[in-house]
């Protein structure tokens, strides 16, 4: 079907309950995959589905057959258009556990549990301060990184904050807090600096500074977005702090202050 594709985009009609069209574009070696004549294929979803799961592509003698299962958008909390909307992303979930390291008592601690605990605290702080708050994960299950980004875009969020925990197995003494932003986003960089400064001041965490990264949730979101690496689980002392409810509260109060500091630097909504 795509064998005659030339440089420049073209589209194919489809008969599908999930997809409205298939677009394709023949590239040279400009997508970074290291292969000549890269073909990029985009599947456009019909209304009523926010993303598709279980996509299969089967080649046949007469063409290519594409099937998928639609996934309906999850129910969202009420959003007041007169307030700022912040999407909070608790890193990992029940399938992608994230880092797993033992605490001082030898009990395995899961990154997914720490991030969700911190996000719940941050949610409560921001709600109390008058923000709209949307969670990408409220429990053990969540969409993948692209689905989390799409959710933030769909609710037209003003800010996106992803909470994670770091690890450095070869340097167990390493500790501290990093905040990441997408390399080409000046607004995300400014947001990252505001969060980094406030979170470190509130918690006393070692300030590792801000850094750029090509993370999916930073690249695919349309708003100012940051990913906070709250500390190193491979450092037993820092892991003890990360597990402490009081420390988590101070840390998230700092992140919330960074949210406010950044938004206060912008024209009023």
Residue locations for each model-derived region?
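Signal-peptide-cleaved, periplasmic/extracellular N-terminal interaction regions immediately downstream
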Residues: 1-85
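Active-site histidine-acidic residue metal-binding/catalytic motifs
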Residues: 68-151, 155-157, 169, 175, ...
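Structural recognition of the beta-strand scaffold that forms the well-ordered cores
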Residues: 85-89, 132-137, 159-163, 171, ...
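Solvent-exposed loop/turn segments at secondary-structure junctions
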Residues: 92-95, 109, 138-143, 165-170, ...
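Sec-exported extracytoplasmic/periplasmic mature domains
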Residues: 120-132, 153-157, 196-205, 243, ...
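Active-site-adjacent mobile loop/cap segments within catalytic or ligand-binding domains
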Residues: 162-170, 211-269
């Amino acid at each position: 079907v795509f064998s005659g594709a030339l440089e420049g985009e073209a589209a194919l009609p489809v008969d599908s309950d999930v997809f409205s069209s298939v677009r394709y574009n023949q590239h040279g070696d400009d997508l970074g995959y290291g292969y000549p004549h890269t073909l990029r294929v985009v599947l456009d979803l019909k209304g009523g589905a926010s993303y598709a799961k279980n996509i299969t592509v089967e080649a046949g003698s007469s063409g290519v057959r594409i099937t998928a299962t639609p996934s309906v958008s999850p129910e969202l909390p009420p959003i007041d258009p007169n307030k700022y909307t912040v999407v909070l992303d608790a890193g990992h979930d029940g399938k992608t556990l994230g880092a797993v390291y033992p605490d001082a008592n030898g009990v395995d601690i899961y990154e997914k549990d720490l991030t969700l605990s911190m996000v719940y605290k941050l949610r409560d702080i921001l709600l109390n301060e008058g923000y709209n708050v949307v969670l990408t994960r409220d429990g053990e299950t969540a969409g993948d990184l692209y689905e989390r980004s799409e959710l933030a875009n769909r609710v037209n969020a003003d800010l996106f904050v992803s909470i994670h925990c770091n690890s450095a197995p070869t340097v167990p003494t390493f500790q501290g807090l990093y905040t990441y932003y997408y390399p080409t986003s000046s607004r995300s960089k400014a947001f990252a600096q505001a969060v980094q400064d406030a979170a470190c001041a509130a918690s006393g965490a070692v300030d590792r500074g801000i850094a750029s990264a090509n993370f999916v949730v930073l690249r695919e979101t349309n708003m100012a977005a940051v990913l906070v690496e709250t500390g190193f689980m491979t450092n037993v002392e820092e892991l003890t702090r990360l597990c402490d409810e009081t420390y988590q509260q101070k840390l998230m109060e700092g992140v919330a202050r960074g949210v406010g500091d950044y938004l206060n630097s912008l024209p009023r909504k």
